[in-house]
From Swiss-Prot:
Involved in catabolism of D-apiose. Catalyzes the conversion of D-apionate to 3-oxo-isoapionate. Keywords: Carbohydrate metabolism, Metal-binding, NAD, Nucleotide-binding, Oxidoreductase, Zinc. It catalyses: D-apionate + NAD(+) = 3-oxoisoapionate + NADH + H(+). This is D-apionate oxidoisomerase. GO terms for biological process: tyrosine biosynthetic process. Pathway: Carbohydrate metabolism. Its cofactor is Zn(2+). The keyword Zinc applies. SUPFAM superfamilies: NAD(P)-binding Rossmann-fold domains. Zn(2+) binds at residues 116, 186. GO terms for molecular function: metal ion binding; NAD+ binding; NADP binding; prephenate dehydrogenase (NAD+) activity.
Amino acid sequence: MAAELKTITVLGAGGKMGMRISANFQKSDYQVFYCENSPRAQEQVVAAGRELSIAEQVIPESDVVILAVPDIALKAVSGIVVPQMKSNAVLLTLDPAAAYANLIAKRDDIDYAVAHPCHPSVFLDRFTPEEHADAFGGVAAPQHVAASYETGSDEQKATLARVVKVMYGPVIDVHWVTVKQLAYLEPTLVETVACMVGTLMKEALDETINTIGVPEAAAKAMLYGHIQIALAVAFRSTNPFSDACMIAIEYGKENIIKPDWKKIFDEKELDLVIAKMLKIDAIER
């Protein structure tokens, strides 16, 4: 039987993600300790009505220790935190990069997990102004979570999922994958591809307005509406693209996308981009 997870420590509680997840934990039944080193960030934690704790005092008591710190700091922070954790506790990180790169300090008698929010879907049915305003998730709009807990049993995953659903809530479902699969989801799928395409569309909009001279309101209206229909047709087959549109699509692929672009799904390319993100020379295994 999986041990119940009752006590949680959030390290980096005053950072961007730390503040987001702490706001949800504050409304939960978990016993939560909030730890933050930065004086300015400490002020934010206190201003939000949360009491600061001393990490060295609460880490040994915690069933789950959450590292809400930047990826590039995880090696150093985990090196300090992991030796202080009690046996059978769970170290939970929020991004897969450092775990994939084997930068997290190791101990045989604790568990490791990663949980990352998917953010509310573009296809989500939203019914309230609060849901419409919540683009990031974790406030009002429901979202999914992708997570990895490779050493966990189904029962342990279910227990940790309850923690994850609180911290990122409201949550529709938690999808369990491997650390490597999670790394392919982010950065490869959603940052290397989706976020890159988002910035490309913004650059194209700017070019249309500033170089071609199309009025800004007209350009935005046309693009924003067509983003919606392009996604609906491509992902949900609501209607087929017209023959003329397909010609324009192929022209765009030929002129914008490299023929070998799918190499980004090669493992060596995943290693390369994550090494760049973590500011390390290479990933060692």
